[in-house]
């Protein structure tokens, strides 16, 4: 056994056939154990100059809406304007607009009815569309819709694919001054006094003739005339004794239009007597105020009042 090598197999295993040597086949395995077959990592793709795959959008990013096949390239405003432009009277009801769109484009005919809500919202929220009420004698349901005349050039060169800008109806400012109109009637017009003379009765002319007395009524004059009137019976009062002078001083229309001066005064007005002094005082009768139609007569002793000697001018203390 001196010539055998230590690496030779023992004699007990010499009867088994020798195992064929396995040659290595294929490239070495990838260093990434979890890599999917047929897909290379991004680092290897970047090293070879290839574009990396697009990562999936995160939860905070918005996905782009997929393009629906067969959908017309017109906005809802363009669809409504197209329907109104093809109408005979340039106006249509909401149901007629739906019918035009479904007859012209098969996409809206087969798709759900959600697009009708968009048509309705665009009609009410855009100033380029104007609602026209239905006439009382025109039977039917719903109002008409038409295009604002100022929005006729809203699309470029009549093409419904491009719209210039959002149409905004011009409104008058609230502080704009209104044009002057005709004067308002009396209940709504501001109060302004009518121009006229300050005096209702014109002053007497400075012509020849008797001038009227300065005061037509004076207590002192009536008291002084009392002794004379006592023996004359029932003369007319001084205010009515000179009709010619009063007529010359005042026009007849003013005298006829004025009410009686003492129509509300009672027949007799008696002032209470003052406190008597230590000695007897002469009593002077007071002429009572009577109506214009009643005559002035003598007064009874009970209707007199006492004048104190300190007052020389009569009833100034009561005026």
From Swiss-Prot:
Keywords in alphabetical order: Aortic aneurysm, Cataract, Disease variant, DNA-binding, Nucleus, Peters anomaly, Transcription, Transcription regulation
DNA-binding region per UniProt: 71-165
Biased composition (Low complexity): 44-53
Cited InterPro entries: Fork_head_dom, FOX_domain-containing, TF_fork_head_CS_1, TF_fork_head_CS_2, WH-like_DNA-bd_sf, WH_DNA-bd_sf
Subcellular location: Nucleus
Outcome when changing residue 120 to G: In ASGD2; complete loss of DNA binding; significant reduction of sequence-specific DNA binding transcription factor activity
GO cellular component: chromatin; nucleus; transcription regulator complex
SUPFAM superfamilies assigned: Winged helix' DNA-binding domain
Keyword Transport applies: no
GO biological process: anatomical structure morphogenesis; cell development; cell differentiation; ciliary body morphogenesis; cornea development in camera-type eye; epithelial cell proliferation; eye development; iris morphogenesis
Entry GO MF terms: DNA binding; DNA-binding transcription factor activity; DNA-binding transcription factor activity, RNA polymerase II-specific; RNA polymerase II cis-regulatory region sequence-specific DNA binding; sequence-specific DNA binding
Keyword Nucleotide-binding: no
Outcome following mutation: residue 103 to K: In CTRCT34; decreases DNAJB1 expression
Main location: nucleus
Region (Disordered): 1-69
Matching PANTHER family: FORKHEAD BOX PROTEIN, FORKHEAD BOX PROTEIN E3
UniProt function note: Transcription factor that controls lens epithelial cell growth through regulation of proliferation, apoptosis and cell cycle. During lens development, controls the ratio of the lens fiber cells to the cells of the anterior lens epithelium by regulating the rate of proliferation and differentiation. Controls lens vesicle closure and subsequent separation of the lens vesicle from ectoderm. Controls the expression of DNAJB1 in a pathway that is crucial for the development of the anterior segment of the eye.
Disease field: Anterior segment dysgenesis 2: A form of anterior segment dysgenesis, a group of defects affecting anterior structures of the eye including cornea, iris, lens, trabecular meshwork, and Schlemm canal. Anterior segment dysgeneses result from abnormal migration or differentiation of the neural crest derived mesenchymal cells that give rise to components of the anterior chamber during eye development.
Descriptive protein name: Forkhead box protein E3
Species of provenance: Homo sapiens (Human)
């Amino acid at each position: 056994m001196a010539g055998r090598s230590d690496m030779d197999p023992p004699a007990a295993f010499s009867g088994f056939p020798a195992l064929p040597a396995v040659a290595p086949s294929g490239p070495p395995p990838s260093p990434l154990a979890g890599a999917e077959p047929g897909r290379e990592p991004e680092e290897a793709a970047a090293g070879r100059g290839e574009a990396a795959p697009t990562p999936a959008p995160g939860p905070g990013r918005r996905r782009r809406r997929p393009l629906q096949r067969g959908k017309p390239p017109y906005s809802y405003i363009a669809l409504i304007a197209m329907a109104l432009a093809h109408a005979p009277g340039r106006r249509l009801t909401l149901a007629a607009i739906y019918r035009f769109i479904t007859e012209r484009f098969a996409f809206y005919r087969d798709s759900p009815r959600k697009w009708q809500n968009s048509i309705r919202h665009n009609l009410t929220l855009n100033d380029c569309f104007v609602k026209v009420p239905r006439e009382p004698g025109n039977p039917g349901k719903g109002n008409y819709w038409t295009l604002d005349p100022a929005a006729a050039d809203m699309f470029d060169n009549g093409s419904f694919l491009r719209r210039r800008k959002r149409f905004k109806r011009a409104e008058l400012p609230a502080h704009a001054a209104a044009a002057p109109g005709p004067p308002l009637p009396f209940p709504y017009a501001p109060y302004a006094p009518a121009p006229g003379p300050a005096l209702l009765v014109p002053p007497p002319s400075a012509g020849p003739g008797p001038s009227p007395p300065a005061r037509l009524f004076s207590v002192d004059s009536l008291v002084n005339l009392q002794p004379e009137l006592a023996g004359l019976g029932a003369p007319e009062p001084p205010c009515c004794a000179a009709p010619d002078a009063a007529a010359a001083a005042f026009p007849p229309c003013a005298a006829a239009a004025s009410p009686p001066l003492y129509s509300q005064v009672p027949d007799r007005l008696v002032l209470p007597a003052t406190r008597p002094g230590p000695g007897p005082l002469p009593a002077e009768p007071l002429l009572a105020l009577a109506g214009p139609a009643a005559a002035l007569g003598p007064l009874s002793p009970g209707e007199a009042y006492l004048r104190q000697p300190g007052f020389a001018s009569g009833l100034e203390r009561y005026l």
